Amino acid sequence: MAASPKINRREHILQCLATMLETSPGQRITTAKLAAEVGVSEAALYRHFPSKARMFEGLIEFIEESLLSRINLIMDEEKDTMKRCQQLLQLLLVFAERNPGISRVLNGDALLGENERLRSRISQLFSKIETHLKQILREKSLREGQAFSIDEAVLANLLMAIAEGRIAQFVRSEFKLKPTKHFNEQWTFVQQQLLQS
């Protein structure tokens, strides 16, 4: 029973951090500002997280769990190559759109001046997602008997660049230009080009 309020307080701190990242674009979040937002002292923050880096790691863990678990569902449930790619990219874009503050973490914007391991961890997450795309594209020849005329790693990188670019535009526009805007039309075009290759 004693652990339950602690978990809730940790979650509340992370929610406040994500909200501050959304409402204060371009500004660095200090522990003093975060403590004021949460309504506790800085010392109380440090009882739940030993450092600000650990708070960001908590957000990154949430991102990883949310995205990777859903990607695994897509991999299990959908067998069509193009639909898998579309759903994976759409998942990433919708997640960023629904979590504007967290999109700053995905973009790396919120991690400037923070511990290097945080940026490295986000980079690793994007590498994992790109690896899933490569796997999807490579399985096309096995599942459908057709291969692409260009290396699957190059195509996976292109698809990731599209998603990362949309997230960067979202952050740069201070969350006005939604990452999912025009995605369906853009995907239709990209898919046609991929199927012709």
From Swiss-Prot:
<keyword id="KW-0963">Cytoplasm</keyword>
<comment type="subunit">
    <text>Homodimer. Interacts with FtsZ.</text>
</comment>
<protein>
    <recommendedName>
        <fullName>Nucleoid occlusion factor SlmA</fullName>
    </recommendedName>
</protein>
<keyword id="KW-0175">Coiled coil</keyword>
<comment type="function">
    <text>Required for nucleoid occlusion (NO) phenomenon, which prevents Z-ring formation and cell division over the nucleoid. Acts as a DNA-associated cell division inhibitor that binds simultaneously chromosomal DNA and FtsZ, and disrupts the assembly of FtsZ polymers. SlmA-DNA-binding sequences (SBS) are dispersed on non-Ter regions of the chromosome, preventing FtsZ polymerization at these regions.</text>
</comment>
<dbReference type="InterPro" id="IPR023769">
    <property type="entry name" value="NO_SlmA"/>
</dbReference>
<dbReference type="InterPro" id="IPR054580">
    <property type="entry name" value="SlmA-like_C"/>
</dbReference>
<dbReference type="Pfam" id="PF00440">
    <property type="entry name" value="TetR_N"/>
</dbReference>
<dbReference type="InterPro" id="IPR050624">
    <property type="entry name" value="HTH-type_Tx_Regulator"/>
</dbReference>
<dbReference type="GO" id="GO:0005737">
    <property type="term" value="C:cytoplasm"/>
</dbReference>
<dbReference type="Pfam" id="PF22276">
    <property type="entry name" value="SlmA-like_C"/>
</dbReference>
<comment type="similarity">
    <text>Belongs to the nucleoid occlusion factor SlmA family.</text>
</comment>
<feature type="coiled-coil region">
    <location>
        <begin position="109"/>
        <end position="136"/>
    </location>
</feature>
<dbReference type="InterPro" id="IPR009057">
    <property type="entry name" value="Homeodomain-like_sf"/>
</dbReference>
<dbReference type="GO" id="GO:0010974">
    <property type="term" value="P:negative regulation of division septum assembly"/>
</dbReference>
<dbReference type="GO" id="GO:0043590">
    <property type="term" value="C:bacterial nucleoid"/>
</dbReference>
<dbReference type="GO" id="GO:0043565">
    <property type="term" value="F:sequence-specific DNA binding"/>
</dbReference>
<keyword id="KW-0131">Cell cycle</keyword>
<dbReference type="InterPro" id="IPR036271">
    <property type="entry name" value="Tet_transcr_reg_TetR-rel_C_sf"/>
</dbReference>
<keyword id="KW-0132">Cell division</keyword>
<dbReference type="GO" id="GO:0051301">
    <property type="term" value="P:cell division"/>
</dbReference>
<feature type="domain" description="HTH tetR-type">
    <location>
        <begin position="7"/>
        <end position="67"/>
    </location>
</feature>
<dbReference type="InterPro" id="IPR001647">
    <property type="entry name" value="HTH_TetR"/>
</dbReference>
<keyword id="KW-0238">DNA-binding</keyword>
<feature type="DNA-binding region" description="H-T-H motif">
    <location>
        <begin position="30"/>
        <end position="49"/>
    </location>
</feature>
